[in-house]
């Protein structure tokens, strides 16, 4: 296709060459350039794509999209843009024929609840007869195709490629998780979401490799409400007024607040042997009783979010309730049967907010003991380690501190940081570096009435050590332990 058609919704300056140039494909990885490619020079945190200009020209690139002037032969067209990541989103959308305009698009952001809510929405809409694509932390789902995820929110080119494949597969709509990094790096530019959902916000993802401070984190998250037609926001969030500041969408709210458009009232814990759940009554825009077999107040918020979205798709009460019963997410309060005496679950809680919410919720079910096993990721904020240690020390009867993804740090050094937070409490703890050994300890020392939580890994099926990912699925580890391996 001609370059001019790829640039039709973008501000740019043509430094040399012709915008009538034919483009074979759009590339942002210099290793994939071929004859006739358009190459986008991305200025990354580690590598600057501009330095690969001589290489991609040698491979046959005919168009360069740049943020600064570069030297290139006369037969190479050079397009100057203010931000090449932003430009890539619009170029990619044009390249794939603006597929988002053929779908109902639902974007969900927030510190927690994104993953569970996306699967709830998918379950409800599919139960009502819609064909739904999904993009998220765990995977992308396009028809019968499942693609393991590398990032919560992929690069803009990949998003548009997925959208295109969803249209080809006959999807009506797509629900996707939208990370603060994805918003900050313009991965979701090039289209406007039909629905943008903001679940909550608490300090997280703050550090040298992520956001400089909470204000930056909040600012990036709230960009979604400037990139959607209808915004659906948690009215109970303490930062609500800042979240909606400058929004350009029509706004709806949900929560327990009397001011919320969709409200939960009369919440109750429900449970039995191997079953932990919650029920509530829905009021406001809809009026019916809801029961979910996922414990905790956050399950109410997740289901409220999903219901608030699906209301716009005219889904019946019957379909909503039926779908919520079967909506399950790998690694999100995932019950694993190991004994009739105690309950064991796997959960992705990997920051203090999520861990506190999870443990506080489970405390409400009055276990004999609440046992929390977790570690923290290497090459990430130390503050997270202190905070998680303190949270577990306060809320768990026993904490088993172990390894998560140590990456390039020594596992014991990470554990030592966690114990700094533990020391602020009277909580009992043991240190077991090897995660399989730690899980075995938890199972073999389980007592009747215990609730045991394996926190942090969730859906992940690997452990990252010194730059390499080794296979490690907690479900497999548990099966091996029970088999005596």
Predicted stretch roles:
Residues 7-10, 88-231, 235, 239-247, ...:
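Phosphate-binding loop of NTP-binding sites
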Residues 66, 82, 136, 178, ...:
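Short loop/edge segments at beta-strand edges and connector loops
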Residues 1-90, 94, 226, 238, ...:
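N-terminal leader/targeting and accessory segments in enzymes
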Residues 44-45, 70, 180-181, 202-205, ...:
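Short glycine-rich anion-binding loops that position phosphate/pyrophosphate groups of nucleotides
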Residues 1-14, 35-38, 248, 285, ...:
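ATP-dependent carboxylate-amine ligase
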Residues 53-58, 167, 189, 363:
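Non-catalytic positions within long, well-ordered alpha-helices that form the structural scaffold/packing
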Residues 62-68, 231-235, 373-374, 397-405:
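Short internal beta-strands
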Residues 7-9, 70-75, 169, 184, ...:
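Acidic, Mg2+-coordinating active-site environments of NTP-dependent enzymes
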């Amino acid at each position: 296709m001609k370059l001019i058609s790829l640039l039709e919704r973008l501000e740019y300056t043509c430094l040399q060459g012709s915008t009538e140039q034919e483009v074979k494909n759009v590339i942002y990885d210099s290793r994939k350039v071929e004859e006739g490619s358009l190459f986008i020079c991305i200025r990354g945190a580690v590598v600057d794509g501009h330095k690969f200009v001589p290489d991609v020209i040698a491979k046959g690139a005919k168009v360069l999209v740049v943020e600064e002037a570069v030297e290139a032969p006369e037969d190479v067209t050079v397009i100057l843009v203010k931000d090449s990541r932003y430009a890539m989103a619009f170029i990619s959308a044009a390249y794939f024929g603006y597929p988002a305009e053929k779908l109902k698009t639902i974007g969900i952001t927030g510190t927690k609840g994104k993953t569970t809510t996306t699967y709830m929405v998918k379950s409800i809409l599919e139960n009502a007869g819609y064909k739904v694509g999904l993009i998220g932390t765990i995977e992308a789902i396009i028809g019968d195709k499942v693609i393991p995820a590398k990032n919560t929110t992929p690069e803009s080119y990949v998003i548009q490629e997925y959208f295109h494949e969803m249209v080809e597969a006959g999807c009506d709509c797509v629900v996707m998780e939208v990370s603060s990094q994805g918003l900050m790096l313009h991965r979701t530019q090039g289209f406007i979401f039909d629905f943008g959902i903001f679940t909550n916000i608490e300090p997280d993802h703050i550090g040298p490799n992520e956001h400089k401070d909470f204000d930056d984190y909040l600012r990036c998250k709230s960009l979604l409400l400037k990139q959607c037609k209808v915004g659906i926001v948690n009215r109970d969030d303490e930062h609500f007024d800042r979240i909606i500041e400058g929004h350009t969408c029509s706004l709806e709210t949900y929560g327990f607040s009397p001011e919320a458009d969709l409200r939960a009232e009369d919440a109750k814990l429900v449970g039995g042997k191997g079953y932990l759940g919650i029920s509530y009554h829905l009021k406001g825009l809809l009026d019916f009783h809801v029961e979910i077999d996922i414990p905790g107040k956050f399950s109410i918020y997740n289901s409220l979010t999903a219901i608030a979205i699906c209301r716009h798709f005219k889904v019946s009460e019957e379909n909503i309730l039926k779908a919520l019963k079967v909506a399950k997410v790998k690694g999100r309060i995932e019950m694993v049967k190991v004994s009739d005496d105690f309950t064991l679950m796997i959960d992705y809680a990997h920051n203090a907010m999520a861990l506190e919410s999870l443990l506080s919720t489970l405390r409400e079910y009055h276990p004999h003991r609440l046992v929390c096993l977790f570690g923290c990721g290497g090459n990430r904020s130390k503050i997270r380690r202190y905070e998680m240690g303190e949270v577990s020390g306060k809320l768990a009867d026993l904490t088993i501190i172990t390894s998560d993804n140590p990456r390039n740090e020594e596992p014991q050094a990470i554990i030592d940081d966690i114990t700094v937070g533990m020391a602020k409490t009277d909580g009992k703890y043991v240190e077991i570096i090897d995660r399989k050994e730690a899980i075995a300890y938890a199972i073999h020392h389980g007592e009747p009435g215990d609730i045991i939580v394996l926190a942090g890994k969730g859906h992940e099926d690997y452990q990252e050590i010194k730059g390499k990912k080794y296979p490690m699925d907690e479900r497999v580890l548990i099966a091996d332990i029970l088999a005596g391996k």
